[in-house]
Swiss-Prot record:
Required for maturation of urease via the functional incorporation of the urease nickel metallocenter. InterPro entries: UreD. UreD, UreF and UreG form a complex that acts as a GTP-hydrolysis-dependent molecular chaperone, activating the urease apoprotein by helping to assemble the nickel containing metallocenter of UreC. The UreE protein probably delivers the nickel. Belongs to the UreD family. Keywords: Chaperone, Cytoplasm, Nickel insertion. One of its GO terms (molecular function) is nickel cation binding. One of its GO terms (cellular component) is cytoplasm. The keyword Cell inner membrane does not apply. It is found in: Cytoplasm. Coiled coil: none annotated. This is Urease accessory protein UreD.
């Protein structure tokens, strides 16, 4: 699986810069199955929110997607999807998606997408590359859920493969290679899904993040493990950041935990409230 020259099912490129008053888009390009809506500035914020849309309604066998986001120095952007990413059955091929985030010093990208739903016989590969300069910041989330299965299997998709590479000043600081392959692995077992079906992931990188801050984040969310049937852990990355992994049987539980983390870090680091991303 490689990001070589090929006919893309959907392609999107977005660049954001700070014009001295607010962050605005400099270059926006999209074609075929991918589209980005005009930015909105929620609650009179100086940060644009972009909604990314798959006009086809779902990912089909053989689809290939690429998205590139460039955030200039001192620019900030919020990115989200307009709905769940649905991966339908891929009997002959598979689906690939590539996302690249280039964030310059004092730039910030906040990506909170809707769940990725893999239906029966789906094969999905996603490769994310995050290139951050030393004072750049990132908040990124993914939620993986199994779709409807005629046979009522807990994991009816063929595989879901997510690869994340994070670079800070061109040095690789995180290589997260996650493969869920029910045909070859006991994904229900220890070290994988541990009797849960839904998986949430979150990365937060900022120069202010240290072990004490990570412990404070954990204190903010630890009550969720008593309130809901879920399990999670926070890991200090080999840089100024952390990753959060959540296991549950419900998307809403994972979303609640991620939102709590997002609200806490955004308030503590940027002194702002999280805007509700209205989707209809």
């Amino acid at each position: 699986m490689s990001n070589n020259k090929q006919a893309w099912t959907g392609q999107l490129d977005l660049s954001v810069f700070n014009n001295g008053k607010k962050s605005v888009a400099r270059d926006v390009f999209f074609e075929k199955a991918l589209k980005v809506m005009r930015p909105v500035y929620l609650n009179q914020s100086d940060i644009p929110t972009f909604y990314i849309v798959n006009v086809g309604g779902g990912y089909l066998d053989g689809d290939r997607y690429t998205m590139n986001f460039n955030i200039d120095s001192d620019a900030k952007v919020i990115l989200t999807s307009q709905g769940a990413t649905k991966i339908y059955k891929t009997l002959n091929d598979h689906v690939e998606q590539y996302q690249t985030f280039n964030i310059k010093n004092n730039g910030y990208a906040e990506y909170v997408g809707d769940p990725i739903i893999a239906f029966e016989n789906a094969k999905f590969y996603q490769h994310n590359v995050f290139n951050l300069e030393s004072t750049a910041s990132l908040f990124y989330t993914d939620i993986l859920t199994p779709g409807y299965s005629k046979s009522d299997k807990r994991f009816s998709y063929t595989y879901m493969h997510l690869l994340n590479e994070i670079y800070v000043d061109d040095a690789l600081v995180t290589f997260d290679n996650m493969l869920l392959d029910p045909q070859k692995q006991n994904v229900d077992g220890l070290g994988y899904m541990e009797d849960y079906t839904h998986l949430g992931s979150c990365y937060f990188i900022h120069p202010s993040v240290n072990q004490k801050f990570i412990e404070q984040v954990y204190e903010e969310i630890k009550h969720f493990q008593h309130k809901y049937d879920c399990r999670f852990g926070i890991t200090h990355l080999p840089t100024h950041g952390f990753s959060l992994r959540i296991l549950s049987n419900k998307t809403q539980v994972i979303e609640s935990i991620i939102t709590a983390v997002q609200c806490y870090v955004v308030k503590q680091i940027f002194d702002r409230d999280v805007d509700f991303l209205r989707k209809y």
